[in-house]
Structure formats: C-alpha cells, structure tokens
Amino acid sequence: MIVVSSTGDATKAINLGADEALTNRAIEELPGEISLAFLPGTPDLPRWLQRARDRGHECYLMLPVEDPSGPAERGIRPLEGTAAPAENLQRLRTVMSRGEGYVGFVVPGPSVVSRSDLIARPLMKELADRGLALIEINPNGVSAMYRLTVE
C-alpha cells in the first residue's frame, strides 16, 4: 500500500517497494518535489533508490518498527520494545546497509519504539551521528523521538 502523506509543505509517498508496478508509477509520474519512502525489504532497493533520485525525488527508507496490528515486513527484523538496545541498534544498521543515497527515515506511526526514551535514544544518536533525517508520522502529538530531536 502506498500512502501519500503531507506534513506542512512537504509531501511524501510512503511504503513504496512492495508492489513493483505502483513503485514504478510513483517514481515516473509523481513530480520530483514529492519525497519517496521505500520499504527496506524492497527487492533490488539500490536500483529503485537510484531511479527515484534520477527523477529528482528525495528518498527515505521506512523505519521498520514492531506493529502488533500487522505482519512484519518479510526478511526485515523490526525494532522492538522487547529487544535489547544493542540488538535494535544492530537491526537499524542492517536496514541502513540495504541502500545508499537516502536522506533519512520515516517512522510509520506511534509505536513502542517511538514512545520510549530508553529505546529511541541510541537509535536517534546513530541517525544524528550519520547526519540522517527522521520524519515521524504521529497524529497523536509529542513522542520520545520528537523530544529527543529537540534536546
């Protein structure tokens, strides 16, 4: 499923990569001003990221976080509230190694990971140390991730 999300002036198409035809259509038909966020388990992710950048799109990866209401992305272990901080950090690094040329991550919504300072802090530090952006889709207000970005 592809969701188009607008936050302020920025519009993003998220969850790209699960459906090849829809992903291709988004890259080819959406204007370059629209940022695209790809699922990290997308087959041949580096090729898709390059194609999107060639068409003028700013690219993000979706941050895989545990979602009790739905299945995890195949082959990608999500960041979890029950995992040790070092394990979540390793999972984040694995996701980061899936492609290059992206500018950051999109957190798909409120989760245990985004609500806990203890869980979010080492992840946020890793992203900040690498100069990567983080966009959180959070209709419920302020989260731990938000608080940590303003520290």
Predicted features, each with a name:
Residues M1-E151:
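Catalytic-site microenvironment of enzymes
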